[in-house]
Amino acid sequence: MRLRHKPYAMDRINEYSHIVIGNPEERAGNWKEVFGNEQPIHIEVGTGRGRFMYDMAKANPHINYIGIEKFTSVVVDALDKLIEEELPNLKLINKDAEDLTVFFAKGEIDRVYLNFSDPWPKKRHTKRRLTYKTFLRNYEEVLVEGGEIHFKTDNQGLFEYSLMSMAEYGMLLTYLSLDLHNSDFEGNIMTEYEEKFSSKGHRIYRVEAKYRTEPMQ
């Protein structure tokens, strides 16, 4: 998908620097001070236009959320939503998630969401998938002990790869759905892509995976 250039994007992001946090590496270890409370912190890697994070933050005021999106022309759409109705428990980061361990201290995050990530279907691009072992290691580094990843996609190939990658990493798969919208799962909050794909009849896959607190036997 080609992203439309928005020349005003950086000016708007700079104007609302209390929402889109600049220099997040300077906040590592101090994100609870940014929010001004001791609530748990959940992050979404690849937050896109922010609907999921916005709806989650609105539904769960007792949890703090951070949406991470590297494309400026996309994250500004998420910002616009927050300008209309600011939520004190939602912040944004306009950076590449490859630097996750620089943005957060060890054990600072309670949960990671991955929603409809780029599948990078070509084999030579495997390392770019957000469930590749390098990314799994980064998530583990910033998550609390026994922290979780919640992952959704409509791409069967990426889902199967992700299950294998998580299992090989030694994670515990605590929830699995091969057809989320026809399951008994309650409280699902949709992303923009999820609504679009499911309306076309695409099956939505979901997995919740937990890092082990003890080595595998």
Swiss-Prot record:
Q: What is its EC number?
A: 2.1.1.33
Give, as in the UniProt entry, the pathway in which the protein acts: tRNA modification; N(7)-methylguanine-tRNA biosynthesis
Q: Which reaction does it catalyse?
A: guanosine(46) in tRNA + S-adenosyl-L-methionine = N(7)-methylguanosine(46) in tRNA + S-adenosyl-L-homocysteine
Q: Where does substrate bind?
A: K122, D154, T191, E192, Y193, E194
Q: Does the keyword Zinc apply?
A: no
InterPro entries associated with the record: SAM-dependent_MTases_sf, tRNA_(Gua-N-7)_MeTrfase_Trmb, tRNA_methyltr_TrmB_bact
**Which residues participate directly in catalysis?**
D118
Keywords per UniProt: Methyltransferase, S-adenosyl-L-methionine, Transferase, tRNA processing
GO molecular function per UniProt:
tRNA (guanine(46)-N7)-methyltransferase activity
Residues binding S-adenosyl-L-methionine: E44, E69, D96, D118
Q: Which SUPFAM superfamilies match?
A: S-adenosyl-L-methionine-dependent methyltransferases (SSF53335)
What family is this?
Belongs to the class I-like SAM-binding methyltransferase superfamily. TrmB family.
Q: Briefly state the protein's biological role.
A: Catalyzes the formation of N(7)-methylguanine at position 46 (m7G46) in tRNA.
This protein is called tRNA (guanine-N(7)-)-methyltransferase
Q: Which organism is it from?
A: Bacillus anthracis
Q: Which gene encodes it?
A: trmB
